[in-house]
Every structure is written in C-alpha cells, then in structure tokens.
Amino acid sequence: MRRGLVTFAAGGLVSAVTAVVMPENPVFCGVLTFMGMATLLSVPVKSLLRRIPPQLGLALSIALFMLLRDVNDGFLGFEGVRIAAIPDGTDWFTAVLGFPPPGFHSSDYFPLLPWLFLFWTGVFLSRLRPERDDLLLRPIPLFTAMGRHSLLIYLAHQPLLYALMPAVVKLL
C-alpha cells in the first residue's frame, strides 16, 4: 500500500511540475500515476486475483488488454482493428479511466484502461515462473542500489536530460 501511495504521489508531483514548467506539454495520468493507482487498486482484489489460475488470469488479462487497447482513441479493438465505437469521455475523471474528453492532451498518458490489464498480466506471469533461489547467485551491488533508488532515478532523469541537452547540441 505504501509503495502505491508513494508512486502515486510522485506522479502527482510530475503532473504539477509539468503543468507549471511546460504548460504546453503537461503530464496528466502519466506512468507513475498509473503505477501508483494500479498498485493501490490491486490491494483490495489481491485475494481474488490469487484465486484465479495463473494461466487463465494471464489469458484473460492479455485478451482484455487487447480488446481495450484503443479505448483512448474511442473504440474497442487492437492496433486499428475497430470492433465497436465508444463515446468520448467528459472530464478529467473519465480521462483517468481511459476515456479522455475531446481536446485532451497529456505528454505521458497511461490511464487505467487498458493498462491495468497489462499490469495484471505481469502479476499472473510472476506466478507462472519457476521458483529458483539460484537465479542470481549473488547480488550485483550497482543493480541492487539502482533498484532501491529507482523512483528517485526515474524522477531525476528528465530534468537531467533537459539540462544536458543544450551542451550536447553545442558539441554537435
């Protein structure tokens, strides 16, 4: 629960900063916000997800992801195969669900639909992997440190790239 709240809050911070610093390209419902929401929404249904056989859960999650892949563009279907049209969203709340209103723009947009089903695909895949303690015999300190600080690294990468790009352009 804590991890979901922290990730969701980090996504809110990114949204607030981009709304001020880059108002022409704000981030609304970006990947961090989504991952926080998906984690928080998965907590109350965790026991239900565990009761679903992993092969069935994997197949259903993939099928629902594919069916809902293009809801953001106003139809059910996958990669341009239009099964049925769906109405536009009406506000920010419907945009979070996956139904953006006309004129909606976000430079990073990962709404609950369809992405929650891809998230749950990972949940079911993790249950299918064999249990092996010897998969990585000894930890690699650099990777361990990066894993412990991955949110901070993610939050720092964009401002760092924006700061370095003018120097890189001058060198070219």
Model-derived segments and spans:
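Alpha-helical transmembrane segments and their immediate juxtamembrane cytosolic regions
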Residues: 1-172
